Amino acid sequence: MKTVLQSKDTAIHPVLYMAMELSHKKWKLGFSNGKKNRIRTIDARDWPALLAEIELAKSKLSCAIDCKMLSCYEAGRDGFWIHRALIAEGIENQVLDSASIEVSRRKKQVKTDRVDVLALLRLLIRYIGGEKQALRVIRIPTVAEEDDRRLNRERERLLKERGAHRARMKSLLVTHGIVLEKLAEVPRILAKAKAAVIGYELPPDLKSELEREYQRYELVNSQVRELERLQIERAESQDIPAMQKIQHLRGLKGVGWQSSWILTMEFFNWREFKNSKQVGACAGLTPTPYDSGDKTREQGISKAGNKRIRQLMVELAWLWLRYQPDSDLSLWFERRFGSGGKRMRRIGIVALARKLLVALWRYLEHGVIPQGAVLKGV
């Protein structure tokens, strides 16, 4: 009987890979030297514990103390502070688009943090090995670029909140037969209005609720106006590239303050596009054909990009038809979809939105005014 001794891996590996599966309470860490894996769990946001596990993994997986380290995690609620902290530690980190991660097509699949972190490790190793299609890496904005988006996003939330207060007041009054035409009428209604037909006094608790609802509406409305004033003040007073782009976009007839602000802060300010295909794809406005066997059809746009930009561009496309009727884009739309029904025009407006977004990108990056477009004041 022969005794076979198991060989030991005594080589010093030059690279240590780390994948992170993040949750609110725990972080699952996966380490690999390309041959052997190590899985550990730490408390969420416990940075000293993370650094200690990294040093221990280097020892356990036979990696040099100063070996090159590559890591990744999925983009999510934790934002980019982890990425910035890893970079500060000298670790090359990649933040992954969750939608690009491969998943099993089985009807039922195992779903645990351990399975997920091992899958991320395999994808990271494939990506670093040259298989760039294994996953999609997202571009990270700077802290300042991230902060630039706060004003328009806060305004977006406040507008929804203001609409909810308005709808609530109208709903409360209509249950007593009173139709509210203007919100400025609420104080007068509370003072002397009576229910329709029967004419009884409005109940006291209803009046109290309406008073509080109106106060909340006025507060939100004042905050919206303050944000809009601040946006205009910054755009007119600050001589920085982002504000210059806003002013440049506003020069086109049909493009207003909010459209130019959102397009700049959410899209054009910090993203780098190499060609028009990347512009359309980032907004999720590119087509997704289905062509398999004898079946060929269009599945609509991908909707894989920035939802705010996609919604804005559809609205802006309708405004473009109204304010720039003699532009080449508007004339193209009328030739292709002008004689069609409502459904065809809705399809066409998405195509126009994609073309318009590309035209605005060329206008900002290369100074090319969209063909036939009119500038304000001309």
Please report, for each region that a protein language model flagged, where it lies by residue.
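Gly/Thr-rich phosphate-binding beta-strand-loop-beta motif of the actin/hexokinase/Hsp70
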Residues: 7-32, 120
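Low-complexity, acidic/Ser/Thr- and charged residue-rich accessory regions of DNA metabolism proteins
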Residues: 294, 333-378
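Nucleic-acid-processing active sites and adjacent nucleic-acid-binding tracks
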Residues: 32-68
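Short glycine-rich phosphate-binding loop at a beta-alpha junction
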Residues: 66-76
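Glycine-rich, often acidic, oxyanion-interacting loops/wings at catalytic, nucleic-acid
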Residues: 152-248
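Short alpha-helix plus adjacent loop in nuclease-associated cores
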Residues: 94-137, 192-193, 295-304
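Phosphate-backbone recognition surface of nucleic-acid-processing proteins
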Residues: 245-251, 257-345
